């Protein structure tokens, strides 16, 4: 009985456990499965251990960071490729220990996880080109698509299976565009174009490429014309000659020196845009190489955008060591007379297995093409790195990520700031007020060709000492130190601008976020003072002229008085010439004059007896002779020389304080 009761209870307990399993545990498992689905749509994480080989772009004060490779802890060795999509706010200030990163949604509706591609940008969109897929674990690439991110709608758009169009110095039309990786990218939003130079193709970039086939390095340049923009170098099959919604592609393979033996294949280099010289500006290609050779730094490849041709230009000065995977940006002097290219970091892979990373900063000043090392000894310089990205805003270079080798366990958050004007590494980014959407120099805002990111930039003193001029520009070295033989550098010149005198607007000029393009009290006060001094100088000049005229009249009057006295032997004072109509002061002149041996003293001269009496005399309307003694009358232009005839020599102060009376005297 007890056994049966126990068995009954045992069965009841079993049933209860089954109910709990079905009613609680299984739903929880279902919730976890749904959570994994949602996690795929969660915002991208901002906390990492290391980050490198990502793609970045700035649009209107926001830095966008997509994909690349990252680890979450020091022990992670695989699964480093990611599709994280982040923004970094450059419109407000922050410290490098806590940059203002925001994770954007990621999911199945966006690009695949790739690294070492490039993020072009227009004024409202991002365009992700190229990149390679994971090699650990090995991942088969998908067919190439250009991925466009619409900033206004916060959504990704896939442009599938693009093909080339025919154009100048380019390959034939209707060739499928390939995905390359580790090339050098650049874009010019005002032109509505992006470029990707060199790189490589292999089994991690191209679908169907066998891993047994060696990597192929490139020296071609792929060009993409953004939707809605024009491009005279490529055939556009629309009535208005503007690219359609899919854009237009061109593969430039025969531009100038590009098809010559001296123009080598390369990957892991950088491109920099320089306004001026050609009709649409020029692009510089620096650094990079292959698994066997490196590109030298004493000769720079120069691409003329308008003619789609490559040239070479020799440099001067001590050159940086050969390297791959550096980063580079450009900043323009306020007057445009010089542009400085900043090149940071990179690595040397030769000999194989003994790679070394760099953390040095170099400046290539254009148009002199002179290398200048930016000394940063004693500063908090970031650890040496390669595969990082650089972007410039408010004349501050923002360095993101980078491969730092095996000795450093983590490099978090891995974002650093370099002041391009002061040549110093900072512990914070400083937002400036009063800029513009393109962040151009204030003197260049009316010209769409002005270089973005240069707002507040001042030419460093070490650069001034080499190219001449001052912090606003005025470079005296306006041509390459090694004379060019051909191309836009031989025939063109930089775009220059007029710089109005203003207070500095660089990050050194005020507290974070204070800016300098708002009301500037010092500038206003200086302007007011300068204006007042200018008015005062004009007035004093006018008073000086009045004083001299009146003094001359006084001396003429005095001489006439003396001649009259001499003519009467001192018996009486004859009438003044008709032009004078007022009385002499009872105080007299106390003046002694002499003619030959005759000395005449005219003292205390008055029209009537009595030292303290003052009267006005009127003259006839004809102005011929003095009339009889009359009653005092209101001052008028007909009786305008009281002070002069009062016997007092005019003073400069008196004329300055009463210029109207002096004018009446002169006009009479």
From Swiss-Prot:
<feature type="repeat" description="Kelch 4">
    <location>
        <begin position="340"/>
        <end position="395"/>
    </location>
</feature>
<dbReference type="InterPro" id="IPR015915">
    <property type="entry name" value="Kelch-typ_b-propeller"/>
</dbReference>
<dbReference type="InterPro" id="IPR011043">
    <property type="entry name" value="Gal_Oxase/kelch_b-propeller"/>
</dbReference>
<feature type="glycosylation site" description="N-linked (GlcNAc...) asparagine">
    <location>
        <position position="291"/>
    </location>
</feature>
<keyword id="KW-1133">Transmembrane helix</keyword>
<feature type="repeat" description="Kelch 6">
    <location>
        <begin position="463"/>
        <end position="509"/>
    </location>
</feature>
<dbReference type="GO" id="GO:0005576">
    <property type="term" value="C:extracellular region"/>
</dbReference>
<keyword id="KW-0677">Repeat</keyword>
<keyword id="KW-0964">Secreted</keyword>
<feature type="repeat" description="Kelch 5">
    <location>
        <begin position="396"/>
        <end position="445"/>
    </location>
</feature>
<keyword id="KW-0812">Transmembrane</keyword>
<feature type="signal peptide">
    <location>
        <begin position="1"/>
        <end position="32"/>
    </location>
</feature>
<keyword id="KW-0732">Signal</keyword>
<feature type="glycosylation site" description="N-linked (GlcNAc...) asparagine">
    <location>
        <position position="251"/>
    </location>
</feature>
<keyword id="KW-0880">Kelch repeat</keyword>
<feature type="topological domain" description="Cytoplasmic">
    <location>
        <begin position="544"/>
        <end position="668"/>
    </location>
</feature>
<feature type="repeat" description="Kelch 1">
    <location>
        <begin position="62"/>
        <end position="108"/>
    </location>
</feature>
<feature type="transmembrane region" description="Helical">
    <location>
        <begin position="523"/>
        <end position="543"/>
    </location>
</feature>
<protein>
    <recommendedName>
        <fullName>Kelch repeat-containing protein ARB_01230</fullName>
    </recommendedName>
</protein>
<feature type="region of interest" description="Disordered">
    <location>
        <begin position="611"/>
        <end position="642"/>
    </location>
</feature>
<dbReference type="GO" id="GO:0016020">
    <property type="term" value="C:membrane"/>
</dbReference>
<feature type="repeat" description="Kelch 3">
    <location>
        <begin position="283"/>
        <end position="331"/>
    </location>
</feature>
<dbReference type="Pfam" id="PF24681">
    <property type="entry name" value="Kelch_KLHDC2_KLHL20_DRC7"/>
</dbReference>
<feature type="topological domain" description="Extracellular">
    <location>
        <begin position="33"/>
        <end position="522"/>
    </location>
</feature>
<keyword id="KW-0325">Glycoprotein</keyword>
<keyword id="KW-0472">Membrane</keyword>
<feature type="glycosylation site" description="N-linked (GlcNAc...) asparagine">
    <location>
        <position position="60"/>
    </location>
</feature>
<feature type="repeat" description="Kelch 2">
    <location>
        <begin position="125"/>
        <end position="176"/>
    </location>
</feature>
